[in-house]
Curated annotation (Swiss-Prot):
Localisation: Cytoplasm
Similarity remark: Belongs to the peptidase M17 family.
Any one GO BP annotation for this protein: proteolysis
Enzyme Commission numbers on file: 3.4.11.1, 3.4.11.10
Entry annotation: catalytic residues: K269, R345
GO function term, MF aspect, one: metalloaminopeptidase activity
Job description of the protein: Presumably involved in the processing and regular turnover of intracellular proteins. Catalyzes the removal of unsubstituted N-terminal amino acids from various peptides.
EC class: hydrolase
Coiled coil: none
Name this protein carries in UniProt: Probable cytosol aminopeptidase
């Protein structure tokens, strides 16, 4: 999908489908703004008959047969005093999603004078594109309806030099993450994930290294390989590197959990644990690879960024890890596996150690790690933990800008008691209470304490069962926008 602007006199505009946003006040005067396509008095009569008030999310549609304009959508934006960019994005995005298969091009005219920055316009464009996203890769009969190819913004004179290039690049990263998460586990295997990562590297000039099981064994990655043992599919440890030209002012590592399917192992997932949905247990790696795609195109200055994914399956066979086994991670720590369904943190233990050995200034890991975070925060907000206040504040700022909600959780040190083992350095799970916190405390044991670190648990936010905001039902691509915005803010 492309974005464009029409900055000429509106009387010269031609198009077949127009979205017009109105506030919940003085509707008659606002309708004067579209007199270039229809008589405002006639339209006011029709609007009044429909008892349209311009309330938030209210939609009217009109079809015309005798003029160039075929369809007019009037969208209510609510009261001016309550106007915010999120409501605008959701209102316009929801409408576009409903009509995406009816138009190849849609034009949008809003009260731009109440939108404060070019960033907000870019984010609106981003929301429209992501709302219109469709994934029909696995349908026998491809959708033969129209495909929305272009969004045109009318009368953006306040922002006449606006560019949508980065917006499109970010959207492509989110869309990649969505495709990866939505792909069934017989399609997205560890091997396929490594192919996807290698393609990103090829397209954008990133360095790429794929470690095989023997390479990981040589590095002492006993925790990661213990998880992979139960699968007939070989694990793939993925490392992409984006290095800016010129002096490097900061080195960053982004680490994603990459379980392409999680059966739970011998602690088999049953009932409410939704084993059939465990294809999305690689949501963290999807966010990291989506960010790699976007940032590879954007090419931020002065940074060296490492994208790291320890990909494998957690399955059951005669070689699978047992509950009670003790394994050694690559930093030398021994771990008693008291729950084979807490496997993500085992793979991350070696991935974080690997990242730490690169001596970055900051590490951020993303993972669909715990059901406990879903109980705590639901499906709209991801929890995060950090050992550094500046990093935490920077992530909060990036979250607010990107529209992906984060909530900081405590690294409650007293809870480490629950990870103590009688026979090893630690267990991989603690008590049920505070489960997402003990998971974060576990991860904190696997990198140099001088490194700034944040862990983002996206278990509740990487998937939605129904259309919600800018997300069609299915994979959301959560995390890509926050990571990219955090990098761009540097």
């Amino acid at each position: 999908m492309q974005f464009s602007t029409f900055q000429k006199n509106l009387d010269d505009w031609q198009g077949s489908s127009l979205i017009f946003g109105v506030l919940e006040e003085e509707i008659a005067s606002q309708l004067e703004n579209i007199k270039f396509v229809i008589d405002p008095k006639l339209l006011l009569k029709k609007v009044t008959q429909k008892k349209f008030k311009g309330e938030k999310g209210e939609i009217l549609s009109f079809e015309f047969l005798d003029q160039n304009l075929e369809t007019l959508f009037i969208v209510g934006l609510g009261k001016l005093k309550d106007l915010n960019k999120s409501d605008i994005e959701n209102s316009i995005g929801n409408l576009v999603r409903k009509t995406v298969d009816k138009n190849e091009k849609m034009s949008i005219l809003l009260p731009w004078e109440f939108i404060n920055s070019q960033l907000e316009i870019n984010q609106l464009a981003e929301s429209v594109r992501l709302s219109a996203y469709k994934d029909n890769r696995f349908n026998k009969k491809k959708d033969e309806k129209k495909v929305l190819k272009e969004i045109e913004f009318l009368n953006l004179k306040k922002f006449e030099n606006i560019s949508f290039e980065e917006t499109a690049q970010i959207c492509e990263g989110v869309e990649l993450a969505r495709r990866l998460v939505a792909a069934p586990p017989n399609s997205l295997t560890p091997q396929e994930m490594s192919i996807q990562a290698s393609q990103i590297a090829k397209d954008h000039g990133l360095g790429v290294k794929i470690l095989e099981a023997k390479d990981c064994e040589d590095l002492g990655m006993g925790a990661y390989l213990a998880v992979a043992k139960g699968s007939d599919l070989d694990p793939k440890f993925i490392h992409l590197t984006l290095k800016s030209e010129g002096p490097i002012k900061e080195k960053i590592a982004l680490v994603g959990k990459g379980l392409t399917f999680d059966s739970g192992g011998y602690n088999l997932k049953v009932g409410a644990s939704q084993i059939e949905m465990m294809k999305y247990d690689m949501g963290g790696s999807a966010a990291v690879l989506g960010a790699a795609k976007a940032l590879g195109a954007i090419k931020p200055k002065g940074l060296e960024i490492h994208f790291i994914v320890a990909s494998c399956e957690n399955m059951i066979n005669g070689s699978a890890v047992h509950p009670g086994d003790v394994v050694k991670a690559s930093n030398g720590k021994t771990i008693e596996i008291n729950n084979t369904d807490a496997e993500g943190r085992l793979t991350l233990a070696d991935a974080l150690t690997y990242a730490s050995n690169l001596k970055p200034d900051s590490i951020i890991d993303l993972a669909t790690l715990t059901g406990a975070i879903v109980v705590a925060l639901g499906n709209d907000v991801a929890g995060f933990w950090s050992n550094n206040d500046n990093l935490a504040n920077d992530l909060k700022a990036a979250s607010a800008q990107s529209g992906e909600e984060l909530w900081q959780m405590p690294l409650q040190k007293s809870y480490k008691e629950g990870l103590k083992s009688h026979i090893a350095d630690m267990k991989n799970t603690g008590p049920r209470a505070g489960g997402s916190i003990t998971a974060a405390l576990f991860l904190e044991e696997f990198f140099d304490k001088e490194i700034k670190w944040a862990h983002i648990d996206i278990a509740g936010t990487c998937w939605t069962d129904k259309n919600k905001g800018i997300n069609p039902s299915g994979a959301t691509g959560f995390g890509v926008k926050t990571l990219v915005q955090w990098i761009k803010n540097k």
